[in-house]
Amino acid sequence: MKTIKFLALAAVLALTACKATTPTTTTTTTPVSRDLYPDASQARTDLAAALNTAATTHKRILLDFGGNWCGDCKVLDIYFHDPANQSILESRFVLVHVNIGHMDTNLDIAERYEVPLEKGVPALAVLDEHGKLLYSQKGGEFEAMRRIEPAEVTKFLVQWEPEKPCSTVMVNC
């Protein structure tokens, strides 16, 4: 009986020692907002606020059309929170999530910015600081975000970020 108790105690101590020496790794995950796309009636207000902000900060506006039901839209949001992408977004863009409901809401905004929602969501459009359309997705490029790498989002953001303002020190701007 003493032998069994001794072996049990030795096993517990050995497991405790192993656990203490096992390196731990931490994984940082970006929480996905359940309501990524605000109430559909808020889109016009958010767009007007973005236009004001962009005009004063000289940022571009990134319109993200989608719905809270859309898994690929949530993947895009995770990619937006990738440190490299988040830095570009925060410093160069004003992001507006446009809730399209179940392809039946805010269709006038999508039409105004030439975004063919029938090609799928998420769908993106880029406006300059004055609200002029610079780019709209025509072929559902981000419709299958689950198959796209975060680097593709980085490439897109870099392609459409505004030019850096000319410094007064630079002669040939």
What spans do the regions from the language model cover?
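Conserved redox-active cysteine motifs that mediate thiol-disulfide chemistry
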Residues: 65-80
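C-terminal motif of bacterial Sec signal peptides marking the signal peptidase cleavage site
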Residues: 15-17
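Non-catalytic, surface beta->alpha helical segment in thiol-disulfide oxidoreductase systems
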Residues: 119-166
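A short beta-strand-turn-helix
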Residues: 39-61
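Bacterial N-terminal signal peptides that target proteins for export
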Residues: 1-8
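Thiol-based oxidoreductase modules, predominantly thioredoxin-like and allied folds used
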Residues: 78, 82-107
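Structural alpha/beta surface segment adjacent to cysteine/selenocysteine redox centers
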Residues: 101-121, 127-130
